[in-house]
Amino acid sequence: MILTVTLNPSVDISYPLETLKIDTVNRVKDVSKTAGGKGLNVTRVLYESGDKVTATGFLGGKIGEFIESELEQSPVSPAFYKISGNTRNCIAILHEGNQTEILEQGPTISHEEAEGFLDHYSNLIKQSEVVTISGSLPSGLPNDYYEKLIQLASDEGVAVVLDCSGAPLETVLKSSAKPTAIKPNNEELSQLLGKEVTKDIEELKDVLKESLFSGIEWIVVSLGRNGAFAKHGDVFYKVDIPDIPVVNPVGSGDSTVAGIASALNSKKSDADLLKHAMTLGMLNAQETMTGHVNMTNYETLNSQIGVKEV
């Protein structure tokens, strides 16, 4: 089983507009609302692509109830820890080929709730082969909270795919609790290292050799339309993807995380792991709704992905 962790989930609201007009009224016809947060996007893609998945994290208030009811109508096993605060909304405005996001901060987690979740999570880990940990930390949790989750998983021999940024990611990278895989982009690498990181292959090689990333088995750097650059152990790969019509790119990174977790769970080869992860990312980009894949086109896209050692 794959366990997904979303500590700061949301209801994701998508507003497609031909043009975003500032300081006036914008009317939206086609609004979509989904149980969201990066980890729940991962969750949906996992079950839609055929994996058994349990979702956990914090939920509270009426918005939390909406998320739980959405998940209960799917093949997902919801196993959330209830809190006193209200789960958040996150809004994505899709306009003129751009994506503008408005993200609520979310609830503040009490010390008692934080400790209670660690016990809850420890029990779930014992039933899991792989865990994904995604997104921001809610207010009230220390930057080393993900480190604690990774250590608990490591103690049980469970692989961890971590997808976060900023101080929580830096704290993990500087700790002894190493995830199995991370999926940074250029912007996140630049933030971590305090210098601009381009998409140049030789530069990326040097960056991923830095001591900050030691002990991490898989590093997959997403390069958008340029595919991905990856490091597994001491081996580097460049992944090339076909040009595709993009409908909604929101959630494609989360879909890639789902692919990495699924491939680790089924012990795929390096090339197959990368192809599976990138295929799910592309399939998501072809859907209107966030964090969804239509597996009908899987083989067609998968066959067009090139993976080469560099």
Curated annotation (Swiss-Prot):
Pfam families: PfkB. This gene was sequenced from pMG820, a laboratory-derived deletion of the naturally occurring plasmid pLP712. The lineage of its organism: Bacteria, Bacillati, Bacillota, Bacilli, Lactobacillales. GO terms for biological process: D-tagatose 6-phosphate catabolic process; lactose catabolic process via tagatose-6-phosphate. Belongs to the carbohydrate kinase PfkB family. LacC subfamily. This is Tagatose-6-phosphate kinase. Its EC number is 2.7.1.144. Transmembrane segments: none annotated. InterPro entries: Carboh/pur_kinase_PfkB_CS, LacC, PfkB_dom, Ribokinase-like, Tagatose/fructose_Pkinase. Induction: By lactose. The operon consists of lacABCDFEGX. Pathway: Carbohydrate metabolism; D-tagatose 6-phosphate degradation; D-glyceraldehyde 3-phosphate and glycerone phosphate from D-tagatose 6-phosphate: step 1/2. Keywords: ATP-binding, Kinase, Lactose metabolism, Nucleotide-binding, Plasmid, Transferase. It catalyses: D-tagatofuranose 6-phosphate + ATP = D-tagatofuranose 1,6-bisphosphate + ADP + H(+). It comes from Lactococcus lactis subsp. lactis. GO terms for cellular component: cytosol. One of its GO terms (molecular function) is tagatose-6-phosphate kinase activity.
